[in-house]
């Protein structure tokens, strides 16, 4: 059973999940030529684990996430959106790719949790919802945007959160590779854009629930909006 679980953790649809370096080399040309929509249209999505992020499953199972309204920017196939959704937590999955959201709706449209989540086609940098969020979860979104867009990302996170809201960042990939996406990150990469605008790091720790190919390359950061 342990071997089966490890194989599951390392795979996506039967394919081994590649390293950040391999993904960066593979994706650069595709994104440059056709953007993220082309990636989803042609099913070139090596970052998609095909299931909810193990850390999110753990946080849900241990009741370690804020309740209320939650947002997952760059939600892709929607796995984490559905995992987080509950009667006490309504989750919005945001993406600019119609194909990604079509896949998410196809996979989860008939889920028994369907009334507790929605998928929305919007750009997180310009979207202004009528209600703000108690929680935002970012994983493989921050590392996918161009590095010069990171201050704008931080501003959007701040503006979309309620006062005293929480931002959870699963920081990845913490490597020394060149280029992207995904672009390399570290804790200071997040601190530099979040702290000056009014976020405080509550905790930063290794992710013990990372899949084998990402062990040692991820950290969990929990941030509170303080002003």
Curated annotation (Swiss-Prot):
- Could you say which residues bind S-adenosyl-L-methionine here? 36, 40, 47, 74, 95, 123-124, 139
Q: Which GO cellular component does the record give, naming just one? A: cytosol
Keyword Isomerase tagged:
no
Q: What is its EC number?
A: 2.1.1.n4
Checking CDD domains in the record gives:
AdoMet_MTases
Q: Which residues carry this modification: Phosphoserine?
A: 86
Q: Which InterPro entries match?
A: SAM-dependent_MTases_sf, TPMT
- EC class, as a word, reads transferase
Q: Which domain of life is it from?
A: Eukaryota
Q: Which reaction does it catalyse?
A: thiocyanate + S-adenosyl-L-methionine = methyl thiocyanate + S-adenosyl-L-homocysteine
**Phenotype of null mutants:** No visible phenotype under normal growth conditions. Increased sensitivity to thiocyanate in medium and lower methyl halide emissions.
Give me any GO biological process, just one. defense response
Q: What does this protein do?
A: S-adenosyl-L-methionine-dependent methyltransferase. Involved in glucosinolate metabolism and defense against phytopathogens. Highly reactive to thiocyanate (NCS(-)) derived from myrosinase-mediated hydrolysis of glucosinolates upon tissue damage.
Q: What is this protein called?
A: Thiocyanate methyltransferase 1
Task: List the source organism.
Answer: Arabidopsis thaliana (Mouse-ear cress)
**Which gene does this sequence derive from?**
HOL1
